[in-house]
C-alpha cells in the first residue's frame, strides 16, 4: 500500500511469492493461474510467463538490474541511505502478531527516511534472504548504510513500513505478508512449464 500525506494512492497490490534458496516466483494474488515472474538468482536468469499465449519471455538479468539500480539510486539519494554514520536503529516496544508469527519491531532512521521492520525468527529464514535479494536487484549500493543496518537484524521481515519526505511531502509504503506456508516447494514452480514457447526480451516495442 502506498500513500502520500496520509492519502492512499490506489487500492494496493496483493501478490503470491514462492521462495526456495535462490529461486523465487511471483504472481498476482487475484490471478493465481495468470502471468508470473520466475527469478532464478542461482542462474542469473528471469522469465515472464504468459499462460494465455503459452510464452516464456527471458528477461535480460543485467538490464533488469540496471533499471533497478537507476530507480534505487534516485530513491537512495532522496532517503540519504548511502550516508555512513547518519543511519541509526532502535527497537520498537511490544510484539506484533503477523501471519501467525510473533514479530519484534525495529526502526531504522536516516536523514529523510524512517523504516519500521517487524521480523519473525520462527520461519527458518534470516534477514540475509531479504538483503541478498536487494543486493541482486542492484539496489544495495545506493542504499548503503541503510542496507548495512538492515543486515544487523535477526529474523525475516513480515512487515516493512517506510516513510520518506520529499519536497515537504510524506510518502509512505507498507508491505505486509499475510500468509506463510513453510515446507518443500515443487521444482516445477521455479521452472518454465513444458510446452511454452521461449522468446528473448528485446528493446523494440511490440517485438520479442
Task: Locate predicted features.
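Extended soluble regions of mature proteins
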Residues: 1-208
Amino acid at each position: 500500500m502506498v500513500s502520500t500525506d496520509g492519502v492512499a494512492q490506489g487500492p494496493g497490490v496483493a501478490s503470491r511469492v514462492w521462495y526456495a534458496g535462490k529461486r523465487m516466483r511471483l504472481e498476482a494474488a487475484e490471478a493465481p493461474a495468470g502471468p508470473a515472474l520466475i527469478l532464478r538468482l542461482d542462474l542469473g536468469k528471469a522469465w515472464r510467463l504468459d499462460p494465455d499465449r503459452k510464452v516464456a519471455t527471458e528477461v535480460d538479468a543485467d538490464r533488469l538490474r540496471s533499471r533497478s539500480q537507476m530507480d534505487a539510486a534516485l530513491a537512495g539519494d532522496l532517503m540519504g541511505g548511502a550516508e555512513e554514520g547518519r543511519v541509526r536503529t532502535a527497537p520498537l516496544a511490544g510484539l506484533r502478531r503477523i501471519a501467525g508469527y510473533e514479530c519484534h519491531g525495529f526502526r531504522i532512521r536516516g536523514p529523510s527516511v524512517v523504516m519500521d521492520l517487524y521480523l519473525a525468527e520462527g520461519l527458518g529464514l534470516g534477514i540475509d534472504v531479504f538483503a541478498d535479494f536487494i543486493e541482486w536487484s542492484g539496489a544495495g549500493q545506493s542504499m548503503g548504510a541503510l542496507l548495512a543496518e538492515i543486515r544487523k537484524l535477526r529474523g525475516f521481515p513480515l512487515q516493512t513500513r517506510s516513510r520518506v519526505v520529499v519536497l515537504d511531502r510524506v510518502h509512505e509504503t507498507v508491505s505486509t505478508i499475510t500468509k506463510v506456508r513453510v515446507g518443500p516447494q515443487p521444482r516445477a514452480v521455479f521452472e518454465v512449464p513444458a510446452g511454452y514457447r521461449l522468446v528473448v526480451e528485446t528493446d523494440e516495442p511490440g517485438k520479442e
